[in-house]
Amino acid sequence: MASVLKNKDEVGNILVKVQDDLRQLKKNIVQFTVQENGEILDIQALDAAIIRTENGIRRHAEDYLKTINNQVLTLPSIEEPEKKTAHPKLVTWQPPYEALPIAHPHRSPIPGPSPGEKHKTAFIMRLLHNPFHPRNKEIFQQNYGIQLPHLQKRTSIGIQRVVTGSNLGNFAIAHLQPKPPPECQDAVAELQPSAADLSSVQTPVQPKAVHVLQREDSGQNESKKVYKQEMDVRRDGMALRRSAMESAESRLLRAPPPSAASASSDNRVLTRGLARLSPINPQSLPVPAVVSKYPFTIVDGQIDPDAADFCRYKKQYCLYWGAMVEALERLQRMLLDFAVPLARVCGERLAACVQSGELNWRDGRGRCTHVEKLLSVLENRDEVWDLMCQPGQRYKGNGGHQAAAVRIQTCWRRYSARTAYLIRLRSKWAAEIIAMSLLKRAKLCHLKKSLQASRLRQLENFHSRAESLATNWKHITSAKRTIIHVPSLGYSQPRRLSLRGYDVLQNTQMGRLCDIRDENVEVIYVSPVRLGEDVLQYYTRLLGLQTAIELGDASATESHSAKRFTILMPEALEDFSTRNLCLASLLKYSPRTLKRIKNLIKGKQAYMISGVTHTDDLAVADELQIPLLGTDPVVTQLYSTKSGGKRIFSSAGVDMPPGKWDIYTLEKLYEGLAQLMAKHMEVQRWLFKIDSEVGGRGTAYVDVCHLKSRPWAQQEFIRHEPQQWRTSQSQDSVMIKFLEEVPHLLASYARLANTSCYKTWACFLEHFLKEGGVIEAFPPSQSLTCLAVDLLLEPGGDVLMLSCGDQLRGPSGLEVLGCTVPQTSICPEVLHSVCTRVGQACQQRSIMGHISLDLVTFLDPNNLEQQVWAIDLDLGYSNQLAMTQLMLMMTRGTLNCRTSKLEVPPSETSVTSRFAVMCTRLLHTNLPLVYYSTFFLMCKAQGIGYDVKARQGTVFALHDSRYRRSLGMLTISENLQGALLTFARNLSIIHQEISAPNMQGASNFKELIKDIEEVLGMTIQNQTASQEEKEITGVGSDWLSTHKLHQHKMSQCTKPILQ
């Protein structure tokens, strides 16, 4: 048995050959009878000898199969190649024909078979040639003793017994014929094994992935020999689906294809249908290819039935020929259709595909899959596929003209159908677009109507509540009330987006909290920024100093007034942090904050004060069901512009600079400037202001000294008197001359006061004509003073002056940095008259609430009389008013604008008046680097603070906790010079403390310090003149002496512009 295990392949081949020879000998003996000397020979002895031989062979075969089936094979090392051994020559057994007697055919006639026997024999032969007939296996078992297995449709060949044979890496060997089902194994074991069961034809079984095991003792030479025998698994038609599922990068072994052409393939990837085949993995261990034993060729799509290779193949697979005929017909038809000249068929692969059911044409997976199956049985399938893929190859074969005609008709029908479909689809699409547009338009119209109805309802409620507020105003101001401060800047969207730090800019009015100095007032302040605990604690302690200030004792207990204010922050701050929405809009979309405000004001008299009124202010007031102390947003947008202010000043009858407004075209700009220059020859500079801009951003100027015709025009003006000049024809000729030079004058000599928003004159001019603007004369004087007055237009009809102060201007002279309170530049009676007329004009236009009026005063160079011009009007709560409220709380005083005095209740000292210098926004790039706690410790160390006993010192206004880019500062002293000196000293100390030698930073500190130092330098020179004027003028001495001081101060501020 050991020898059998050693040479199992040889023993199997010998047993098969002996079995075939015995079967052939028995068949020949049965077919004829022999006769010797005229007598019939007895061949029973020979038949018995053959039977005994068959029984012996059967026993040996059974022992062989039992031994092989019980053997467990182990795979050899991957890197250790199989040793090549010389295959022994197969021994072919032949019966000893010499020992047989010479048999001669019997000469006596043999009777032929009956018709029934002939019919039965023909029927049996038909059944034998049809392996799919149910009785095929039964007839084989009855007539030949062969138990055939059940033929089943399988996608892969499954081997259920232990495979025997030589170990080839991770591959096993099995015959093409499938194994009988398990229920027939016992019956088959009792019979003699057939030739198919013992055949040594090597075909692949189902491949299984085996992990590569590295061996340290394997040499490089052996590995090189193994890798030379590389195979391309892409040519295995039976493993198409499996190879598509396996990764090409995994280190796994693949089953080898049973094709002789695989070893010499060019490893090209098939396109289209074959593109799904996985590429060969160079890391896997290759195995030698198995050469086909039964190949045959198909020439020009036809099989030669007389060819030797085809006859040999047909003889080998005669039992399954009925199933192979259909596959061969399909293959021939395909080769004929594509005019393939030569195709080599691998017989074993074709038989395997037929038996496994892979060539089942009724699986419905498409023509591409059928072509794959057919090509998988060809040894030269790459060449055939390349030929089939050539353009027009199908039309060269059988039925090419008809196929071309079908293709043309198909393409044309497809084109026609596609065109008709696209036309219909386009119509359907157009209908859908129209329907969607109509639906969208209908919804938008409905939404617009809803919004209009909602805004109309809010506007009606605003007017009705305003009337109720006007009726009960005196009662409300004398009783306990709650004021809701919403410091919203309701600018237009382009202006809001162009402002840097818009949220902090809205929070520069924290001084509104100081309204709680009235015992009947509670304040709810809505902050547009997130305030930290440091800022909240600062204002809590600051507002709690009222008792200490009133008693003049810093150690006094904290006042209960700090409990009468609430600071709220809308929850929508984080949701709209980058959209620059005004505070009213943020509050509108903050339902929790609105609900909390409702709870705080429930059962109390309350009203709301906004900044620059916006439409959402009305929505918030309507949601809270409280009146709004402000102006209708439409009216605010109309009169808060530069042109709107000019119209109010004109109707009020106050003096204002010569100019023109509502300019929207370039021709009107040129003509208006030429007319103004010709009419007012004394004006040396003209200003251009954009209607919607604030803070001096949208201002430009041009000097008339650059006109070439200016000397000639001046001579013409001198020849006429001022009264005659306005009516003479010379003015018209001068205007025409000026009109010719104006375009060049503006393009060459126009300058911008602030380049932070508009860099060039062209950019400024574009926005000027787009948004509208005004032309305004600059005061014709070297000494001028600007001041601002805050008015309250009460719902009851009264006009109150809440604050008045002289402005501190920046280097450009057109930008406000701070102010001094109270004002000392204009006679209080004149100021009160101007403010009253402007306030009444505003009330006639339904303007209510807080407004801010900008004035300029100077001495007329012709008659040296003081002139007061109204230059600007802002509708809303101003920063100066907020700082004034902080000043009044810290001094416990009252500001009497009728006399321009800040009256403080007397204390231990005899001083009963104070002066204050305030700045709303002190900017420094190093301020964000210092926390507020460190900042106040620094101020305390440097002696910067507020004396509650003397009611003078320094107070800061904090704006936010996050960025800390700016802060406000207020200095209070017994006189104006002391307040200015304290303010300048504080700026100098703060600048030195927060700035390093190598990092000074950008700020507006230096400009303010320089301006204040120049003003203080003139104080000593004016003291003597002030004393003399007090003796002469009596009552008016207080404001006249300081008027000269401020005239010099403002002249110093405007010198950079006049140069």
Curated annotation (Swiss-Prot):
Record region (Disordered): 245-267
User: From the record, what ranges are coiled-coil?
Assistant: 6-35
Keyword set, alphabetical order: Coiled coil
**Which InterPro entries does its entry note?**
ATP-grasp_IQCH, IQCH
Specify the domain of life of the species encoding this protein.
Answer: Eukaryota
Q: Where is the IQ domain?
A: 401-430
Which is a Pfam family this sequence falls into?
ATP-grasp_IQCH
The protein's matches in PANTHER family, at most eight in alphabetical order, are given as:
IQ DOMAIN-CONTAINING PROTEIN H
Query: What is this protein's record name?
Result: IQ motif-containing protein H
Species whose genome carries this gene = Danio rerio
The uppermost taxa in this organism's lineage are: Eukaryota, Metazoa, Chordata, Craniata, Vertebrata
